[in-house]
């Protein structure tokens, strides 16, 4: 069975797959100090709680936090006796081309999303991922990754407002009932929510104009459903896009061994 690990700046997700069949998933905070033994105890406890007695034979890792990769490698080797595939490393092949100035600088999560998007929707895509950063990744007609845009994440923007202005409280993001807020919280929520609606729409329109073609816009990430319901910003929402991409990359590497 395959264990796919998606390590982001905020959270790390572990998912079990039996071929293309999803089995289970768990989420924990990303902490670079966490040891291989701690990963195993945490994962084993959750598997036992769900009465999952399975043999993990393969591991694939995508990590935007380089410092955690070493301990995840040790975790895979020590407890599952397997050498994990790590997206972005030379021995992990991708089924799509990367056509940018510095391919090694592209975040692994963005490459994985490109693979997943092309597998599910074909080419000519703009992949919008609402994570710690809000990223826009452009997928060419043949599935190649050809660049993108990085903007501050929604929650990061809210936190920056709270940290930088003493009078502004910490608030959660939600769709406001009106654009004009009548209290501080509503004003902040309106500014961030509608500001990001405008940001997404403008960036996507400029990408389409620059590439002189119609492109489908696919959203993913924790806050994507909140924006998915707003003014037809996206052509589709895909939950667990990164995990799907990891399974595609794993299968591709197995087939090319």
Curated annotation (Swiss-Prot):
Cited InterPro entries: ATPase_NBD, Type_III_PanK
A GO cellular component entry from the record: cytoplasm
Broad class of the protein's primary localization: cytoplasm
CDD domains, A to Z: ASKHA_NBD_PanK-III (cd24015)
Gene3D superfamilies: 3.30.420.40
EC number per UniProt: 2.7.1.33
Positions with a binding annotation for K(+): 129
Pfam families: Pan_kinase
The organism's place on the tree of life at top rank: Bacteria
Catalytic activity: (R)-pantothenate + ATP = (R)-4'-phosphopantothenate + ADP + H(+)
GO molecular function: ATP binding; metal ion binding; pantothenate kinase activity
Residues involved in ATP binding: 6-13, 132
Subcellular compartments: Cytoplasm
Active-site annotation: 109
Family of this protein: Belongs to the type III pantothenate kinase family.
Function statement: Catalyzes the phosphorylation of pantothenate (Pan), the first step in CoA biosynthesis.
Protein name per the record: Type III pantothenate kinase
Annotated source species: Roseobacter denitrificans (strain ATCC 33942 / OCh 114) (Erythrobacter sp. (strain OCh 114))
Top-level taxonomy: Bacteria, Pseudomonadati, Pseudomonadota, Alphaproteobacteria, Rhodobacterales
